[in-house]
Amino acid sequence: MKSYLRLLWGIALLGCCACTTSQDRTTLLEVSPRSVVLPHEGGDEWIELQADGAWTSEVSPPIAREWLTTEPASGGAGKHRVRLHVAPNADFAQRDASVYFDAAELSQVVAVTQAPTLVTPGRLELPALNTTEYLTVGSASEPLEVTLSPQAEWCTAVVEGARMRIRVSTNLGAERSVTLHVTAGRFTQDVVLVQRAFDPARNYGDGEVVALQRATSGNGVCLVVVGDGYTLAEMARGTGKYETDMRRAAEAFFSVYPYSAYRSYFDVYMLTAISEEAGMSCVSPSETVDTKFSTLWQGVSTSISCDDGAVRDWLTRVT
């Protein structure tokens, strides 16, 4: 009889243990999304996790833990938001890793990809004068596409092999900026270009009138000295090429008789004129230069022509 009771008691205990084990078993582990792509500059992505038991996470391969972290790294039953954080990626190669979520015998994996750096630097400051600079282009598997936002006529961006040519025209106003949207397949990167403001304290602006001499005899005969084919880079006050050349031109004028004898009768003015490009156009050999007055040299002798109407209109700035 005692043996029979012991057998019944053992069966009851076994049933209780089996029941307890069944109730404690983890049967639910869900994560979403299963794959994420993060930008090269770094950032966060959130994973929605639901489990009915304790869970843990692990980043693989181990070297990826230098740039990828999870928070929290573990938890209990319930719904959780797990933050995936990636550090900036300065390399021209994409990063790939996996985050494994485990709960008892259940496992889920999230694939993590971080975009590569497409071009460097990510921000470029440019001078006020027209200039050309270059960005370094990475070895992306997809061809690069570039758009400007907002559209800016003063800026162009062209990919040339392993570099991107940036060209800006002269800025005579306030500081301005534009964003380059660079795309290579599914990866994107924004590059900010800032062109500095024109500094009137250090440079002459377009169409400024500067008195080089005042008449001390008579009513004053007006003489205006103006040049063509000078860019903003040559407009420094006092030391720039434009002012130096205009003063030399005035001195050359008064070095010839009879002007040398009557110099005191003249009011002499320098009128600034800023061109997009330096120099002048030429017929032979053929060369076109974008200048204020379209000055053209025939290529032989000293024959030079220009847009006379544009010059006359410009001279009206001197009153």
Describe these PLM feature segments.
Residues 110-116, 191-197:
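Interdomain boundary/hinge segments at the C-termini of tandem beta-sandwich modules
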Residues 26-29, 52-83, 141-165:
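Surface-exposed binding patches on compact interaction domains or structured appendages
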Residues 87-93, 169-174:
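Short, surface-exposed loop/turn segments at beta-strand-coil junctions that are enriched for proline
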Residues 199-319:
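Zn2+-dependent metallopeptidase catalytic core
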Residues 17-37, 104-109:
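Bacterial Sec-dependent N-terminal signal peptides
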Residues 1-17:
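Sec-dependent bacterial lipoprotein signal peptides
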Residues 93-105, 174-185:
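A short beta-strand micro-motif common to beta-rich folds, especially ectodomain repeats
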Residues 36-42, 125-130:
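Short, solvent-exposed loop/linker segments at the N-terminal edge
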